[in-house]
Amino acid sequence: LILDELKTLDYYVVFGVMNAADFGSAQRRTRLIFLGSRDGEDLRLPEPTHGKVGSDGRKPWRTLRQALDGLDDPEPAFAALSPAAIKVMGHVPPGGNWRDIPSGIQRQALGKAADSWGGRSGFYRRLSWDSPTPALTTNPISRATMFVHPEEDRPLSIREYARVQGFPDDWIFDGGVRDRYMQIGNAVPLAVSEAIGAELRQLISHRKASSRKRKGIIACADATLIERFNARPRTVLNPQRMREVEGLAEARKWMASLGGSTREPLDVTVLDEAA
């Protein structure tokens, strides 16, 4: 729907997945990014500056240790883990998670998640100093997405969270602890914003007439992303509040009215072919 609307408006659009760690952020946060030009200008997604191992002229991914280096946070503000969670976290080393909990107390610690969601690595997760963090969430003590400090039995503090997201130390967040975690967790990593801004600034400063109109064209920066989307079946498993029908039988009828589970291929081109 997004792509159809942008094409109707005659925008030239490029899109693709960007990992914040590839642009200097200390977190592995992948997001689908769209850039659009009403004038059909030659937009490009920025090229990564960092890589997991640092090769091909790219720097290695930044680690949590690097992100928090020199942080002055003598009285950190953070959400409190429950006494039970603190007791369990005593068994989890830096970089570990629920799999490090002794088998004798693992099921009790996980509760119902032992049967349903126990495979998620976010349960009782203690961060590693020597790698980027996973994508920050709005609640670092949620059972399935914990962000526990590598050495202390607490989640990352507000200021540590902000450092990982790229905010300067003097940036002010309003509200209580929960509100501030939410503001930071919902933000776009500053490294990604900066990379996109630099790409757009370069485009504007080198603006020149194009021999080919690109208005109304939708281009994807990654051909494999198009293949993955087209191979994915249409599903009825939307969140309950978003479902238009109730019950499996009615859902199947609704799907059949739309042509079944087969998804219509994306009407997009690969970026190099649009240039």
Sequence positions of predicted segments:
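Conserved Class I SAM-dependent methyltransferase catalytic core
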Residues: 1-37
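S-adenosyl-L-methionine-dependent DNA methyltransferase catalytic core
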Residues: 5, 31-275
